[in-house]
Amino acid sequence: MGIGFVTKHLSQNHWIAGRFGRLFVAGFACVATSAALQGQQPLQLTIHWDKTSVVSKSTPTFQVVVNPPLRRGEPLSAASYKAVKELGADYVRYVPWLPYPKLAVAELEPPTQQKTSWDFSLIDPMTIDFLNATEGHPTVMNFSTMPTWLFKTDKPVTYPADPNQPVWNYTQGTELRDPTGKEMGDYYERLVSWYVDGGFTDENGVRHESGYHYKFPVWEVLNEVEAEHSMTPEDYTKRYDAIVEGIHRASPDTKFMGMALAAPRDHPEFFEYFLNPANHKPGIPVDYISYHFYASPTRSQTISDWQYTFFDQADGFLSTVRYIDNIRKRLSPKTKTDLDELGVILPTDNTAADKVPPPAAYYNLAGSLYAYLYIQLSRLQIDLVGESQLVGYPTQYPSVSMMNWTNNKPNPRFWVLKLIKNSFHPGDSLVDTNLGGSGSGDVEAQAFVTPTGRKVLLANKRDHAIEVKLPDAQKASALTVDESTGDEPARNVKLTDGYIRLEPFAVSVVSW
């Protein structure tokens, strides 16, 4: 969950438009007979393997948000980065964010002629652990929290001495103290130089050596900018250009991503302005845009409601995606899209109630939602489909976590992502796929022709088991994530009698 969670926490009703609530899932697939399940007839899956509808551009991925449990030496940190490394995803997003200034901001005090406050001692361990865990894969870096001294404020903004203590009002100020943006661009130039150029020279001419020579393939410029520092499209575009200029001086090969909007459907003006090349300085690239979606139920709803609310809200978001993509194609057709925060936020998050975990099936339901979004966004040829987020825990959006903080294991949301990531890739052909029968809307299905064979992705959106009759089932095998797999990887499913049984909220990949 990126940085705007804070803002949503402070004004939840407004942000529901941009990040919606939480999913609850329970599901598993297993061998089924041809007998119909009680209350629902089996669905019939028909696939035309020779009829390609679209070629996928979509990479399944996720984000890592800096939180204290990810600090080096914490048990959850070691387990989490082990999971990241074993997953091996491309374009994982890394976001040190605003509640923890000491873990996110490298120069917390304004420089003077006598001294500067550059300090990476708390930032480096988590960042290096992330870069080591993603070695060999492109990443999306985003140090989105700027030093507040860059902005005009009535008085200096304070922050806790304890780096683990959250503060929700750090991002104060709307007007830069240097209206040209050069001071801000210089901060990011030095920050990036620390990691890619072995160090930097500070404002007083003092050299700071790191010895690091990492590559930053993609840099996302700030986060949820309509909230943090209350930027207008004009403000943000000017600041984007200044930051890109600064980072390009340190890392000429880096590509850039913009906006990371929390509430995209509320802000078409950002897309119209930012994607227009005439509004940028000459030579400033807009390689990617990004924006977010969270499903969010009301407090009175239960899991029996969530199974409808989440997918209904997802469909609303998909309409927003289509609208935004038309703007992109019109103004900047070479720009790619990263939907880098996709998930659910339950209304109990960050309250006393979030210490009571949701039903176990919730995480399967949330996994089913991600699978549904991956299918739909692949059809729309969205480039990056990013699940949010690796680590959450009570007081810090536990409903969005992909790790079980009680046992340090990946939860079903992680295993659904791994199943999809291992099965589907950009370049796969999506072919005509049809589910027939009463209740066909309860399951989403999409067949792909991949370099490793023919596959279909199935997502049960409902809290009851559903049978699906498969073509050529005798030649097929299946993997599934469901309630029976718990915090363990997808399991093999033996198919008999031509059917697969999708247990509540199951996500399955059938291969031929």
Regions found by a protein language model. Give the residues of each.
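Substrate-binding cleft and catalytic face of glycoside hydrolase catalytic domains
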Residues: 87-310
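Carbohydrate-binding surface patches
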Residues: 438-474, 481-483, 505, 509
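C-terminal beta-strand-rich structural cap/linker in extracellular carbohydrate-active enzymes
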Residues: 491-512
